[in-house]
């Protein structure tokens, strides 16, 4: 099912479909390995719910919810 990265629950995995953003932030996320087909797993969030931690290619990334709303993913069963 297609959704956005911010909708993943802790422990849930998905594959990147597309980045719906432009400019420096898009480039930075691509450099971190957030490209189409890459598996990402939600590890949880900070005490206030933001940022959210994700595991991408063995690296832990902290993304703000507003940024993760711009990343389309396909959830895995």
Annotated model-derived regions:
Residues 3, 45-77:
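C-terminal structural segments of small proteins and small subunits
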């Amino acid at each position: 099912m297609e959704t956005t990265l911010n909708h993943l629950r802790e422990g849930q995995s998905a594959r990147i479909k597309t980045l719906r953003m432009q400019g420096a932030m898009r480039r930075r996320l691509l450099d971190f390995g957030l490209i189409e087909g890459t598996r990402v797993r939600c590890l949880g969030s900070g005490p206030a719910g933001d940022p959210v931690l994700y595991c991408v290619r063995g690296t832990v990334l902290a993304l703000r919810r507003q940024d993760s709303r711009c990343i389309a993913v396909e959830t895995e069963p």
